[in-house]
Amino acid sequence: MLTERYIVAFCQKDIKSISALLDEKFVLEDPVVKRIEGRSAALEAISIIFKSCEKLNFRAKKIYKDKDSTIIEFVLEIDGVSLEGVDIIDWKDGLMIELRAYLDIPKA
């Protein structure tokens, strides 16, 4: 349920709903931003992504869950560019404590 709420919020560029899912000490890692620590800093980075694109669609191909972790195989479309990747999310007490994103980024 939490994972699905995150996916919907991300697709809707709903930074307030995303914020409600993140722990204060949330850590975001991905190939672009590298490593960001803290909810506020991560939300700022996510906001920049949202503002930089007109059209964004995040589609989960498969979701794997256990007690405290989720793995999402996904396709992310940003302004007509399609990226495939995997998000590994760690949860604690109903909040996301870490998200590690692995993307197949096209070479220029």
Predicted regions: what they are:
Residues E4-V8:
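Amphipathic alpha-helical repeat scaffolds
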Residues C11, E29, L43-A108:
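A beta-strand edge to alpha-helix "cap/lid" segment located at domain peripheries
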Residues L2, Q12-K25:
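Short, well-ordered alpha-helical segments enriched in acidic and aromatic residues
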Residues V27-E37:
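A short gly/proline-enriched turn/hairpin at secondary-structure junctions
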